[in-house]
Amino acid sequence: MPIRPPLKELNIKTEDKGFYKGFNRFVTVTSKVLVTLVVIWILSDIERSGVILNSMKNWSYANLNSYYTYAVAFYVLVCLTVILWPSFGRTKLGDPNGKPEFSNFSWFSMIFGAGIGIGVLTYSAAEPIWHLANNPDTIMAKEMILTALSASGTPLPEGADVFAFYQDQIAANTLVPIEGVVIPKTEGALDAAFRYSFLHWGISAWATYCLVGICLSFFCYARGLPLTMRSALTPLFGKHLEGALGNIIDISAVIATIFGISQTIGIGLGTFASGLYSITGISWLVTNPINPEPTTGALLLSLFVVMCLSIGSALSGVGRGIKWLSNINMILSFLLLAFFLIFGATMFALEMLGKGIFSYVVNLPAMVVTVWDPNTELGAWQTSWSIFYWAWWIAFAPFVGIFLARISKNRTIREFGLIGIIAPSLTLFVWFSFIGGTGIDLELSGIAGGKIFDSGLTAQLFEIIGLMLDSTMANIMSAMVVILLLTYLVTSADSALLVVNTVNSAGKDKVENGAKHLIIWGVALTAVIAALLLAGGLDAITSAMIIAAIPFSFIIILMAISLLKALIMDS
């Protein structure tokens, strides 16, 4: 039986006149209507909608933790396979003699800025600190202690801290030390603190992004198909993608992008507002000065500023506003990192970097497929951290994937993968080791006195800076962080708006009324984030993001199968 030649033409219907000229009317209008309905539903009953979103999130955590875990493991396996398999990796994503549009520095800057730029400023300081206090190793240690106490007939006093009581029993020689017990907030918990931070921000995240990006680049530049999500499924569904099936796939990508970027911007807005409070001390920016959390008013004002700048940047295009902003925030990022390299806990951070990478690599195969019962304490930890991240990266993948494809023409699959996965992962490991490591060192040495542990997620970076410097220098450094956050927020939002326009216009870079649609989507994204903030703050945004990620997670699985089929047939 002869092998069918690959499909190299996909006729996606677009309008030839009017406001939607150049756009697929069904995808564009349906996406706008769905987003509008979500906003109306939330605003019609803010309290009730917040409760419903939270219930749906909890259902997803309870029933889809295994699915999310194995789906991401599958993405990693497929992505590494196509990169490392000799004939696959040599495949050129474009003209065999063509040269990349952007320099390696600009390309990497845009990858990093759009991919996880905002989150790293918040979580590089916060996540190692949080894991030092609570992680699977300490949870299993607690279970071991409780089992030992039960076996020895020693009752745990009501309300007593398990670890403090255990250490008291050891000191009193009434209990034999248990091998393998990891005590929270001690040096024994360092390995897990960095191992799990690297798990969440390393290969799993970037392989998910790059898998989508490679799929789209291959089918767009090597096969000549439109740069839109449905094109990546042509080996499976062929011409059927020209109709309703393809429309559904593209709509799913738009919805996932809107809610995925909402999560990222929401986190960034919280840190941005915390930074403004750290610099100015304006009371209305936070709920209370003892444990400052950004107020809804501060978040909404920050959102308005960010989205106005983002729409302006998006209108200037990838080659101008986004490129230059990406270069600026990369330079500022490395200035911030240099500050921690020079003034932070350098030797401690280097030790954590080396040990953390070793522990991460050794344990990665087991960590990516481990699933705990969501009804246990271990399962609760996994859903609130790992499953949250997997859903976030999946919801973010259509945006980052299309954006990566737009800037990666004429690179090979291996070049795309090696730079797109390894370079950002290693960069993030350095960030977490030096910024989070400095915070941990301040706590373990007693200098911080629990201040970093007690700070909110979005305030911990500024707390670390405040402990390292006098008030004047701390304000200057905090101001630089706030500016850096603003550039990351604008870069991420404007890139997302361009991606949404790309999907709606059947992969076209420029369409006649593109600027008007960019403005509409900018307003729509602002309305979604504002409505979710009113409905329950960052928790409501997280709930919506996790729900939006579910359908697109299945589409990525199909894209992976489609890419493998195409590469095998070509070879």
Task: Indicate residue ranges for each PLM-predicted region.
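Terminal cytosolic tails of multi-pass membrane transporters
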Residues: M1-F23, L84-L93, S152, N410, ...
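C-terminal membrane-solvent junction of multi-pass transporters and transport-like membrane proteins
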Residues: Y20-T30, G89-S109, M347, E351, ...
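Interfacial loop/helix-cap signal at membrane boundaries in integral membrane proteins
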Residues: V51, S55-W59, L132, K142-W201, ...
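Membrane-embedded translocation segments of transport machinery
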Residues: I248-R411, L418-I419, A423-M480, L532
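Membrane-water interface regions at transmembrane-helix termini and the short interhelical loops
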Residues: E15-Y20, D45-Y61, V82-K99, A193-H200, ...
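N-terminal alpha-helical transmembrane segments of multi-pass membrane transport
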Residues: P2-N173, L315, A338, A549, ...
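Helix-loop-helix module between adjacent transmembrane segments
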Residues: F19-L43, V76-V78, I116-V120, A151-G159, ...
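Hydrophobic alpha-helical segments of multi-pass membrane transport proteins
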Residues: L34, Y67-L84, S333-G344, T427-G437, ...
